Design a protein with these regions (language model features):
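Unchanged
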Residues: 1-235
Length: 235
C-alpha cells in the first residue's frame, strides 16, 4: 500500500474564484478562505492526502493565490525533501499556452510537464474547495485490484436531488457506463431506483490514460476542457 501511495502524484485544483462566497473571496481564492479559526478550506484536501500516506502534492493555483501560498509556506512545512516528499504551488507555466486555465482539465494539461517529470503510476485529481473526510488509500487499492484506467469517488443521494451534480451510471460490477453533468433526468443506481451516484470531483487515473485524454481534449476547439463535462465522458 505504501508503494502505491509513493507512486501517486496528487494535483489539487485551487483556481476557483468562489463567487458565491463573496465578500470572503474578495482578496483570496476559495480554497484559502478561513475555516474554524486558523484553518483554511484547502486543509481538508491536504489532511485527507497526508492521512492517506500521499506525500507528492502539487497545488494548481491561479486566482488571487497569495494568501494560499503564504498558508502553504507557514503551515505545511512538514515535508522531507531528501525522501522525495513535497508540496508545492504551481501556477500556469506558459509551456503550452499563454492564457489562464480554461477549465479543470486545462489546468492539469497546462501543467502536464510536472506529471511527465514526476512520472507517477497514478495521478489523483482533487478539488481544493471541497469539505469532506476521505481515505484515498481505499481508492488506490480498488484501482489496483480492478486494474482500472480511472476511478471516480462517488456518493449516493436521492435521485430527486441529483440533477445539481455530475451523475454516474454503473453496471452490476460498478463499471462506469454513463456520465452526465447536471442532467435534467438523473439515472438511478442499479441496486436502488430511489438513489443516484454522484461524482465527488475526485478522480484517480493511470498516468498514461490521463495524459492521452488531456492531449486529445486539448486539440478540441469546442471542448470546455472540464473533467466532468469532457474528459470522463470521453473515456
Amino acid at each position: 500500500m505504501e508503494l502505491l501511495s509513493r507512486k501517486t502524484l496528487v494535483m489539487v485544483l485551487c483556481g476557483g474564484k468562489g463567487e458565491r462566497l463573496y465578500p470572503l473571496t474578495r482578496d483570496r481564492a476559495k480554497p484559502s478562505v478561513p475555516f474554524l479559526g486558523s484553518y483554511r478550506i484547502i486543509d481538508f484536501s491536504r489532511s485527507n492526502a497526508l492521512n492517506s500516506g500521499l506525500r507528492k502534492i502539487a497545488l494548481v493555483t491561479q486566482y488571487k493565490s497569495l494568501s494560499l501560498d503564504r498558508h502553504i509556506i507557514n503551515g505545511w512545512n512538514i515535508f522531507h525533501a531528501e525522501s522525495g516528499d513535497y508540496i508545492l504551488s504551481i501556477s500556469a507555466q506558459g509551456r503550452v499556452s499563454d492564457s489562464w486555465y480554461e477549465g479543470t482539465a486545462d489546468a492539469v494539461f497546462q501543467n502536464i510537464y510536472t506529471i511527465q517529470q514526476e512520472n507517477p503510476d497514478h495521478v489523483l485529481i482533487l478539488s481544493g474547495d471541497h469539505i469532506y473526510k476521505a481515505d484515498y488509500r481505499r481508492l488506490l487499492l480498488y484501482a489496483e485490484q480492478k486494474d482500472a484506467d480511472a476511478v471516480i469517488m462517488t456518493r449516493t443521494i436521492p435521485t430527486a436531488e441529483a440533477s445539481r451534480f455530475g451523475v454516474i451510471g454503473v453496471d452490476d460490477e460498478r463499471r462506469i457506463v454513463e456520465f452526465a453533468e447536471k442532467p435534467k433526468k438523473p439515472f438511478a443506481a442499479p441496486w436502488d431506483p430511489s438513489v443516484s451516484l454522484i461524482s465527488m470531483g475526485v478522480y484517480l487515473f493511470k498516468t498514461p490514460v490521463l495524459v492521452r485524454a488531456l492531449l486529445k481534449d486539448a486539440r478540441k476547439a469546442a471542448s470546455s476542457h472540464d473533467f466532468g463535462k469532457d474528459i470522463i465522458p470521453s473515456l
